[in-house]
Every structure is written in structure tokens, then in C-alpha cells.
């Protein structure tokens, strides 16, 4: 019986040591969305005079919109647990906080983004035991193919905001809306606890990318 106890003791200690390092740990990280934008290719439309020449300005139209999801970056503090982000809720507003792209101003989407923990293995190794890891701040950028926070409806509404038909348009900001994204990321940390990360007022740059003319 005494022999059995001696054999069991190292197993119990090993189990306690492995889980003990996580007791009291939490997720300590921040996230930022940068570079999100919508470019609009616009055509200025003019009336055709009887002789076929260009007449009066009739208005402008968006021919093509070009969305860019941007880059979702994380700053993970040393010793933080990792996190797998599984969903996002995005609320679109203008710069004053008024809902934008209604009734599609709220967008829910699924994600699969694995944010690493705030530890690194020696020598840049990809795997090692926990006792070999060192608590270190980690910078992480979500894979572009996993990122979908700017919905098609919001992108179209943003591009359309550049055109009101009242004046001839030129390339640049113009009268385009100032769009903001208020994002709540939800997922589970390394221990399976549900966590949320908020990104308030992420800016969407909306601009007139190119301008052409048509006489009709």
C-alpha cells in the first residue's frame, strides 16, 4: 500500500502543476480593426444635345463598389490565455452615432480566428511544454480569409452615400458618409470560458475612387 502511494504522488503533483498555472489566469488582450474602406467608381451622367455634344449634368451613379475588409490586429499581453473567436456582432453608425445602412445596420457573422496565448516557446519553436514557455507579449493579425466584418449591404450603402446627384463628382472623399463599426467579438479562451472583446468606433474610409463621364 505504501508503494502504491509513492507511485501515485508524482502523478497527482504533475496534474496539479499543469492545471495550477492556469488558475486565476484570464484573457488580457486588445483588438483593433484598421484599413477598412469602400471605394466607389462613379460615372457623371450628362444629357446629349441635339447635335450630339455633351449637355447639362443629370446626376451621378455608382458603377462599382470596392470593399476592403481591412486588418484585425490583436495585442496579447504576457501571460494571457489564448482565445478562439467564433462570432462577431457589428453595429454600423455614422460619425454622430446614428444607425447607418438601416435596416441592415446590425450584422452578425461567424468567425474562426485563433488568437495565440501570451507565451512563446524557446528559439521560436512552434511547440514545447508549458514549463518551457516564457510569458511574452504577442502581436497577432487575423488571417485575411477569416475576416468578414463589413457586410455587403453596408458596403453598398457606403458607396451609394457618395452620390446624391446634386453636383458633379471628382475623385476623393467628396460627400461620402463617415461610417463607423462597433464590434463585439465572442469566443472561448484556452480553458473554455466564454469571452468578449469590444472594438468601438472602428473607422471605415469611404471615398470616390475613379470618375468617368457618360453622355446619354
Where are these regions (language model features)?
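Non-catalytic macromolecular-recognition regions in eukaryotic signaling proteins
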Residues: 17-216
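C-terminal motif of bacterial Sec signal peptides marking the signal peptidase cleavage site
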Residues: 12-15
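Sec-dependent signal peptide recognition
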Residues: 2-9
Amino acid at each position: 500500500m505504501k508503494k502504491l502511494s509513492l507511485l501515485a504522488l508524482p502523478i497527482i503533483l504533475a496534474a496539479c502543476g499543469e492545471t495550477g498555472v492556469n488558475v486565476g489566469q484570464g484573457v488580457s488582450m486588445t483588438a483593433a480593426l484598421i484599413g477598412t474602406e469602400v471605394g466607389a467608381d462613379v460615372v457623371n451622367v450628362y444629357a446629349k444635345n441635339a447635335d450630339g455634344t455633351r449637355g447639362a449634368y443629370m446626376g451621378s451613379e455608382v458603377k462599382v463598389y470596392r470593399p476592403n475588409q481591412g486588418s484585425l490586429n490583436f495585442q496579447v499581453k504576457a501571460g494571457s490565455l489564448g482565445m478562439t473567436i467564433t462570432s462577431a456582432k457589428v453595429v454600423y453608425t455614422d460619425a454622430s452615432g446614428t444607425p447607418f445602412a438601416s435596416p441592415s445596420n446590425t450584422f452578425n457573422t461567424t468567425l474562426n480566428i485563433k488568437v495565440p496565448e501570451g507565451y512563446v516557446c524557446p528559439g521560436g519553436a512552434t511547440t514545447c511544454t508549458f514549463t518551457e514557455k516564457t510569458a511574452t507579449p504577442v502581436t497577432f493579425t487575423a488571417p485575411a480569409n477569416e475576416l468578414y466584418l463589413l457586410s455587403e449591404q453596408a458596403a453598398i450603402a457606403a458607396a451609394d452615400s457618395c452620390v446624391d446627384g446634386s453636383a458633379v463628382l471628382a475623385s476623393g472623399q467628396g460627400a461620402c458618409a463617415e461610417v463607423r463599426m462597433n464590434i463585439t467579438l465572442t469566443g472561448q479562451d484556452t480553458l473554455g470560458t466564454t469571452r468578449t472583446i469590444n472594438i468601438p468606433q472602428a473607422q471605415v474610409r469611404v471615398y470616390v475612387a475613379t470618375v468617368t463621364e457618360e453622355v446619354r
